[in-house]
Amino acid sequence: MVKLEAEGGDLLTLRFGPPYAPGDEDAYLGALEAIGARAAPFALLAVFGGRGRLSPAGERSQALWFKRTRAGMEARCRALAIVRPGEPGRSAEVFGRLWSFPVTVAASEAEGRAFLAAQPPP
């Protein structure tokens, strides 16, 4: 299941988790495109449930999106909280190198929301 929701204020929430469906990878990549095209400033909460994986082609598309949208993300995203179950590995380090805005990897959605709420407004 993939969902991109605009919540109150400037918060965008991207959800990618079970139950997984055949079109999830395309929906996830489409959600990234929608985030990259957003004109208004925002904070992003990315909630990943389970251990769904992208195909090699999906990984490549995601990496190209990171490169293509870097300047726009720097200009409009004020912070990113990534919620991952279990051991996040090096996620915070990897994503923190992509952008200069604040990035955290949280164990729960509540922790991610608290991090975003503590960031200064745009």
Tell me the role of every PLM-derived stretch:
Residues M1-P122:
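Amphipathic, Lys/Arg-enriched alpha-helical "gate/interface" segment within cytosolic domains
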